[in-house]
Amino acid sequence: MAELDIGQHCQVQHCRQRDFLPFVCDGCSGIFCLEHRSKDSHGCSEVNVVKERPKTDEHKSYSCSFKGCTDVELVAVICPYCEKNFCLRHRHQSDHDCEKLEVAKPRMAATQKLVRDIVDAKTGGAASKGRKGAKSSGTAAKVALMKLKMHADGDKSLPQTERTYFQVYLPKGSKEKSKAMFFCLRWSIGKVVDFAASLANLRNENNKLTAKKLRLCHVPSGEALPLDHTLERWITKEECPLYNGGNVILEYLNDEEQFLKNVDSYLE
């Protein structure tokens, strides 16, 4: 009787056994019997080849350059002054002790002079009138402060002595016109902006170079406060200070915009 052509011969030279259910090696693609189906048993030519597989879940991360900080971000957050990478918590100059912080001071001095000129123009330039206006603003802020303390949102873990309260007027087009908030006196303006944005659920793309920046603006001058200054610095200023219990404005501005226009329209 003729032999049926069923199955295949094992490719191991000293074996050549016909197997009706042969195994195909996924390494060398050879045909083998049950005894020689493992790579070791048939001396597979591919057994020592290491195939690199792409890691589909691997993401590039960026470590913070601030000493002692172990935070990482999925996007690069580079300080435009010292050009080092930081986490969102340390991205502002004052928060990472930027080595280039002094460079901005001459420009800020000129900006402060411009603010004084604007305020003087609005008040007629009279010193006595200016002092009277400042006293009036301070008194109004003290009255407002008592009301703000009753319903302001903020970090409840902050000591009472470090809390500073504001009526924060939100960007045009927001669902709410304003929101009472309190912040730590020692925070940088940049951190105040980030915290206020989270409380009011505002879009905050301050870490993107091309996007409009969310800025905290002085009332009544409309000056966009430098992100690296501290809140305490503006509370203790002799000229054009921020008042605990006073008003501030949040708005999206381009990098070249240093002042907010139509300040009164936010307060109406």
Swiss-Prot record:
Q: Which domain of life is it from?
A: Eukaryota
UniProt binding sites for Zn(2+) 3:
64, 69, 87, 90
Gene3D superfamilies xref list = AN1-like Zinc finger
Species, as recorded: Mus musculus (Mouse)
Query: What is the stated purpose of this protein?
Result: Plays a role in the regulation of cytoplasmic stress granules (SGs) turnover. SGs are dynamic and transient cytoplasmic ribonucleoprotein assemblies important for cellular protein homeostasis when protein production is suspended after acute exogenous stress. Associates with SGs and is involved in the efficient and specific arsenite-induced clearance process of SGs through the recruitment of the ubiquitin-selective ATPase VCP and the 26S proteasome.
Q: Which residues bind Zn(2+) 2?
A: 25, 28, 42, 44
Q: Which GO terms describe its biological process?
A: cellular response to arsenite ion; positive regulation of intracellular protein transport; stress granule disassembly
Q: Which residues bind Zn(2+) 4?
A: 79, 82, 96, 98
What is this protein's name?
AN1-type zinc finger protein 1
Species lineage: Eukaryota, Metazoa, Chordata, Craniata, Vertebrata
The keyword Repeat is annotated on this UniProt entry = yes
Any one Gene Ontology cellular component term annotated for this protein: cytoplasmic stress granule
Looking up Pfam families in the UniProt record yields: UBL_ZFAND1, zf-AN1
Gene behind the chain: Zfand1
Keyword Methyltransferase belongs to the record: no
Its primary localisation, in coarse terms, equals: cytoplasm
Task: State whether it acts alone or in a complex, and with which partners, per the record.
Answer: Associates with the 26S proteasome; this association occurs upon exposure to arsenite and is reduced in the presence of ATP. Interacts (via AN1-type 1 and 2 zinc fingers) with PSMD1; this interaction is increased upon arsenite treatment and occurs in an ATP-independent manner. Interacts with PSMC4. Interacts with PSMA1. Interacts (via its ubiquitin-like region) with VCP; this interaction occurs in an arsenite-dependent manner and is necessary for the recruitment of the ubiquitin-selective ATPase VCP to stress granules (SGs).
Annotated GO molecular function terms are: proteasome binding; zinc ion binding
PTM sites of type N-acetylalanine: 2
